[in-house]
Amino acid sequence: MNLGKRIISCIILLILLAIVWLIGDVNYGKIETMGRAVVDENSKKVALTFDDGPHPFYTKQLLEGLKERDVKATFFITGQNVEAYPEIVKQIFEDGHLIGNHTYSHTQLTSGNAERFKQEIIRTNEVIKEVTGEDTIYIRPPYGSWNKEFEKELNMFPVLWTIDPLDWCSNDASGIVKNVVVKVKENDIILMHDQYKTTVTAALEIVDQLTKEGYEFVTVDELLFD
């Protein structure tokens, strides 16, 4: 996606969020469109998470930078990209990062597609296991849309976020970094997307700056349950 389209998409998303805020909560019955991460506030840890990947080039760059810094992250990947780039998924796994489900085709849960959404989760779990040999229990539902009934039905734990620097609609790495470092606090979950060069640059700079400030980067399972 080029910069112009990314900016337009970002503006549209912000307008939609503003409309929702003005008219009040949208009720989809048992569907939750937003959520809050529940975290332990007793340690100075943060989790860096990446959605939508892997990317054939930028994810490799990111993995190299994280390995150089001895930092572990969490990657919520789509089933389509697992099938397209299994060798990168294997590298993510072998490097010690946590892998989570992001549906097969980045499908958002709505009031009318619950069965399709569920099948995308199941299919993605299957293709991830084919590559890593391990089951996946963490999911980041696209756009934060989730149905609590799926947690027991599919044995999946949803992971949302506390900081979103909107890296996917920016070509300004320094601005992305600033959006994170001025807001971050212990136990935050940072949302980013490993599909863009600017994200890789920004993510590694975020790691460098927050490490100097005494933060420890952990995977989301460590943050939520250790």
How should these model regions be labeled?
Residues 1-48, 64-73, 185-226:
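Terminal accessory/targeting
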Residues 7-15, 19, 23, 31, ...:
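Weak global preference for isoleucine
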Residues 26-112, 116-117, 123, 127, ...:
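Active-site beta->alpha N-cap acidic-glycine motif
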Residues 107-216, 221-226:
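Catalytic domains of cell-wall/extracellular-matrix polysaccharide-remodeling enzymes
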